[in-house]
Amino acid sequence: MNPIIFIIILMTVMLGTTIVMISSHWLRIWIGFEMNMLAIIPIMMKKHNPRATAASSDYFLTQSTASMLLMMAIIINLMFSGQWTVTKLFHPTASMLMTMALAMKLGMAPFHFWVPEVTQGIPLSSGLILLTWQKLVPMSVLYQILPSINLDLILTLSILSIMIGGWGGLNQTQLRKIMAYSSIAHMGWMTAILPYNPTMMLLNLIIYITMTSTMFLLFMANSTTTTLSLSLTWNKMPIMTTLVLITLLSMGGLPPLSGFVPKWMIIQEMTKNNSIILPTLMAITALLNLYFYMRLTYSTTLTMFPSTNNMKMKWQFSTTKRMTLLPTLTVLSTMLLPLTPILSILE
């Protein structure tokens, strides 16, 4: 793709996100969603192959359906309130449709079907944008309509997402699909805490984006997309492979890594609000995610995949791609736990 065209498209994606975040008018929010969706598709199709085309088509159809649901909710709200302002959804049907549309855009269960397939079919750089930047817009709208959200519906979607995110990743060998199911589970954690403490949802979103960005940048540096190719990078880049595995464990929420912080704080906040059964179920289900991350770490470090690769240790002579942000992101993705007392300002 021509670099100038790519920059223009990327700026359009950012503009669409900005329009949604600063708007208080439903029509402008819908326009921002559409700009964002239509601009991301050429980025997903950077590599012209059938898989990228199919993934982009799936993404377009799913997001178009979600946009139609969103517009229907806006029109129902307009009929009952007579205003376009984002203040309150005046009808339960509008609230339900809006929540379902945003859940579909976020890739939450039971609307998660598109996330693994789309992520698997596109390049790593496009997958990074899809699983990080594209979550900002729906989350910002959920944050704005928080007083009107049906609590039972949003918590049901949350617990379903955490379960599907754990179960779906168990039999995967493709790293992009593992990241997609991890994203589904993290969306569940974020929306679960949203009704109780919206500020904590923002903290969780920041940590999630940091960890996911680190993972994708490490995958791009290692040129790995499967568990087999990850295990074979020990010979070439042992330090980078170690960072991949530590960050994976952080995403699973293993203490004392950064990924443990949001889970700990979310469970603590929910128990303070006399919700006991739901956080217990969430904590147990989160073990599924941790299990497949630990299994991946074990199989990569302590066992050797069947391979005809007889290459010797090349890491002393290999040159790696220079990535400026990677050291900072890696530190943030793994070592935030000692800073947890500072987060008492969220109380």
UniProtKB/Swiss-Prot annotation:
Record carries keyword Mitochondrion: yes
Superkingdom of source: Eukaryota
GO MF annotation list: NADH dehydrogenase (ubiquinone) activity
Catalytic class of the enzyme: translocase
UniProt keyword list: Electron transport, Membrane, Mitochondrion, Mitochondrion inner membrane, NAD, Respiratory chain, Translocase, Transmembrane, Transmembrane helix, Transport, Ubiquinone
Pfam families per UniProt: NADH_dehy_S2_C, Proton_antipo_M
EC number of the protein: 7.1.1.2
Reactions this protein catalyses: a ubiquinone + NADH + 5 H(+)(in) = a ubiquinol + NAD(+) + 4 H(+)(out)
Cellular localisation: Mitochondrion inner membrane
Any one of the GO BP annotations: mitochondrial respiratory chain complex I assembly
Main location: mitochondrion
Segments crossing the lipid bilayer: 3-23, 25-45, 66-86, 96-116, 122-142, 145-165, 178-198, 200-220, 237-257, 274-294, 325-345
CC annotations in GO: mitochondrial inner membrane
Membrane topology: Multi-pass membrane protein
Signal sequence residues: none
InterPro entries the UniProt entry points to: Complex_I_Subunit_2, NADH_DH_su2_C, NADH_UbQ_OxRdtase_chain2, ND/Mrp_TM
Assembly notes: Core subunit of respiratory chain NADH dehydrogenase (Complex I) which is composed of 45 different subunits. Interacts with TMEM242.
Sequence similarity: Belongs to the complex I subunit 2 family.
Functional note: Core subunit of the mitochondrial membrane respiratory chain NADH dehydrogenase (Complex I) which catalyzes electron transfer from NADH through the respiratory chain, using ubiquinone as an electron acceptor. Essential for the catalytic activity and assembly of complex I.
Stated name of the protein: NADH-ubiquinone oxidoreductase chain 2
Organism, as annotated: Capra hircus (Goat)
